[in-house]
Amino acid sequence: MELWKRSIKELKELIEKKEVKPSEVIESFAQRTKDVEVKIKSYVTDLTEQAVERAKQLDEKISDLSEIPELFGIPIAIKDNISTEGIRTTCSSKILENYVPPFDATVIKRLKDKEYVITGKTNLDEFAMGSSTENSAFFVTRNPWDLDRVPGGSSGGSAAAVSAGLAPAALGSDTGGSIRQPAAFCGVIGLKPTYGRVSRYGLVAFASSLDQIGTFTRTVEDTAILLNIISGKDPKDSTSADREVPDFTKFLDKDIKGIKIGIPEEFFVEGLDSQIKELVMESAKLLEKEGAELVSISMPTTKYAIEAYYIIAPSEASSNLARYDGVRYGFRASDYSDLEEMYSKTRDEGFGAEVKRRIMLGTYSLSSGYYDAYYLKAQKVRTLIYQDFMKAFESVDIILTPTTPDVAFRIGEKVDDPLQMYLSDIFTVSVNMAGVPGMSIPCGFKDGLPVGMQLIGKPFDEGTIIQVADRFTKLKDFSKDFPQL
């Protein structure tokens, strides 16, 4: 089997046994990138040449090591809203097109400590605002399973890269579904950890109370390996949780007898494609055969999640994005007569339509006279959504839902209808609102396009999600299914 088809775990073992060199691993992925990247366009900054050079250095280093670091020579792609020292970090926005950060995000530092190799910075919806990666200021990334369709968003580039075999894993960020929805559309595994599990230091902020960095992989085992590395308290992020990080690989290869799985009626409603509903319920029944118990539950407030999310997230964005004014870094308009005109022209020329829409929505929601009617009310709904989850978790260990209401849609299909676009996150946003962990895993295909199933866990209980997902993928394994490109 070609090296680019192998998982982190498999590559790690081959390198440790000295059966392959890091350079051979990276060259295999570099060749794959050369062959297919032109079709899918997942990278804003393609770093495969530098990756090959870095791997050659690791070849020489390996003989001097008594212990080989966990990600030694393993290629990983990084979403382009995560700071990488000395490497352009654009957020797929014109306003940051030439911005090169002077520091690494904490997650990048943790990967570097394990000697990973960065393959590139992946495309996204501008400032992570979108569900299709069509809002990138540079180009549209395509779904490897059907090049006329979107890969999902906002982390579409990361999902497409892992799906097409350009890297065995990638990092993304998830504010309302931006890891899980593209993972479902591209047929890979996407995990959004509990809010606070992974440091956000160095993640360019969209909505600070909702954003969380997570992973894309092809196997649950690889998810566990990466989560072990990137999790944990960080003094540079006051919202990172001071909680002990368990060894997530200990949750692999366990049975699921007696685990109670909640099936919420609000997630199996009109608007959900009938074939997806069937596939997800078949998958739930498979888990039941393995000894899990299926429990019908109700989470009535979750149906208001989208409305509340599109007040809270834009409100936080309008505040966070105020810093892009052309003064210290990033794009600056060239033709202006005074400071005020420089600000407004820079922001007008630098931001795309969706980002402007959300800044305006957020500013409106926070303005005097509307704050109580919109923002405050949305925060109250958020509390009720959290309480819905906590009540459900009194009787179940994990919740199972579809990840998306339908498979990947065609490029251009929803561009002129933002509300339709927003609804593709209908099953994912409530997880961010409650701050709980969620994972999308492939559970089948509809008309040749991947379908995702979502597993939602208690706060800081990614372990049970990994346990159930691992058991499921041993029954239905899609990790070696690659799209024909």
From Swiss-Prot:
- Tell me which EC number(s) this protein carries: 6.3.5.7
Q: Show the catalytic activity.
A: L-glutamyl-tRNA(Gln) + L-glutamine + ATP + H2O = L-glutaminyl-tRNA(Gln) + L-glutamate + ADP + phosphate + H(+)
One function term, GO molecular function aspect: ATP binding
The function of this protein is:
Allows the formation of correctly charged Gln-tRNA(Gln) through the transamidation of misacylated Glu-tRNA(Gln) in organisms which lack glutaminyl-tRNA synthetase. The reaction takes place in the presence of glutamine and ATP through an activated gamma-phospho-Glu-tRNA(Gln).
Name one process (GO BP) from the record.
translation
Q: Supply the InterPro entries for this chain.
A: Amidase, Amidase_CS, Amidase_dom, AS_sf, GatA
Q: Which UniProt keywords apply?
A: ATP-binding, Ligase, Nucleotide-binding, Protein biosynthesis
Stored Pfam families = Amidase (PF01425)
Q: Which family does it belong to?
A: Belongs to the amidase family. GatA subfamily.
Q: How does it assemble?
A: Heterotrimer of A, B and C subunits.
Native species of this protein? Persephonella marina (strain DSM 14350 / EX-H1)
Which GO CC terms are listed, alphabetically?
A: glutamyl-tRNA(Gln) amidotransferase complex
PROSITE patterns registered for this protein in UniProt: AMIDASES (PS00571)
Q: Which Gene3D superfamilies match?
A: Amidase signature (AS) domain
Where does the record place the catalytic residues?
A: 79 (charge relay system), 154 (charge relay system), 178 (acyl-ester intermediate)
Q: What is this protein called?
A: Glutamyl-tRNA(Gln) amidotransferase subunit A
